[in-house]
Regions:
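SDR active-site lid
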Residues: 190-253
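Residue(s) in the substrate-gating loop at a strand-loop-helix junction
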Residues: 158
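Substrate-binding pocket helix/loop in short-chain dehydrogenase/reductase
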Residues: 113-115, 119-124
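The beta1-alpha1 cofactor-binding region of Rossmann-like NAD(H)/NADP(H)-dependent oxidoreductases
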Residues: 55-56, 76-87, 120
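Active-site helix of classical SDR
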Residues: 138, 174
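Conserved glycine-rich cofactor-binding loop
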Residues: 29-30
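Conserved glycine-rich Rossmann-like NAD(P)H-binding loop of the short-chain dehydrogenase/reductase
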Residues: 45-60
């Protein structure tokens, strides 16, 4: 485990409850996590501790932050290993660092496939990164966070936890587990720790790099663009939701459709969503619908 530290600075801005707080963000090297790091620092004067595995990307983030890099430090480790979280907690405690907010954002999206085509190794890896990393982080961090007067935990789940579609069995299961656990922990620590749950829909980040998009048709591309949310907007929505201390945050056109559809129409929403994907012939779902 490696830690690169920078001097903490200050900035002037309108106060909100997490201004100038110390925030831990996992999955900080790209996508939503990277966006959160930059916004929390630039707009709220937060001191951010980023966690990721890719040192090259973390160094690039430091460069992007420019003179704001003094607000940033990072640790390099695999969030799916519980011992890494123990070492992390021990290290920041020994350094006298008091974190206020933990944002569990790290996650992976397995290639869309039929359940029977996943190996047990694929399944275990998805559950470890998407679910157990949250378990391990909160297990060691909650006692530390309770020492803060502005304690908060934000777990990033997915719209897949709201409505499962064909090809996402493992991903949906891992994110649904995060959702259920978060909702329970919220009640257990109500009044002591703000606990927020984020269920983002399709977001234009590199989490889809495992998916084989192939040569999508114009209709398919337009459909993806129509339901996808830019990373910048998603980050803005999440930070705004945290500012308002929202309990459940469902962001993105597709996520809201899946959430509302499940509430009013139950499992029919999963059936309709899967049927639409099948009919538009998205290449990234070819192993789900167009192979044995």
């Amino acid at each position: 485990m490696f830690c690169k530290k920078f001097k903490i600075g200050e900035c002037d801005m309108v106060n909100c409850w997490f201004d100038y707080k110390t925030v831990i963000v996992s999955g900080a090297s790209s996508g939503i996590g990277k966006g959160l790091v930059k916004k929390l620092i630039a707009d709220h004067g937060c001191t951010v501790i980023g966690i990721a595995r890719n040192e090259k990307r973390m160094k690039a983030l430091v460069e992007e932050l420019g003179d704001k890099a003094r607000y940033f430090s990072y640790y390099l480790f695999d969030v799916s290993e519980k011992e890494n979280w123990r070492n992390f907690a021990k290290d920041i405690t020994e350094k006298g660092i008091q974190p206020d907010i933990l944002i569990n954002n790290a996650g992976i999206l397995p290639k869309f496939n039929k359940f029977g085509h996943y190996s047990l190794e694929n399944i275990d890896r998805a559950m470890q990164v998407n679910f157990y990393s949250n378990v391990y982080s909160m297990n060691v961090m909650i006692p530390i966070l309770l020492k803060s007067k502005s304690a908060g935990i934000v777990n990033v789940s997915s719209s897949a936890a709201l409505c499962s579609i064909a090809g996402t069995s493992i991903y949906s299961a891992s994110k649904a587990a995060v959702k259920s656990m978060t909702e329970s922990i919220r009640e257990e620590y109500r009044g002591r720790i703000y606990v927020g749950l984020v269920c983002p829909g399709f977001t234009k980040t590199d989490i889809f790099h495992n998916q084989d998009k192939g040569q999508e048709s114009d209709i398919s591309e337009k459909m993806l663009d129509m339901v996808s949310t830019s990373c910048e907007k998603m980050v803005n929505d999440i930070v705004n939701g945290i500012w308002k201390k929202k309990s459940n945050m469902v962001f993105g056109i597709d996520a809201r459709m899946m959430n509302d559809g499940t509430r009013f129409f139950g499992v029919l929403t999963s059936k309709i969503s899967s049927s639409v994907i099948r009919k538009v012939h998205l290449d990234m779902f070819k192993d789900v619908f167009y192979s044995e």
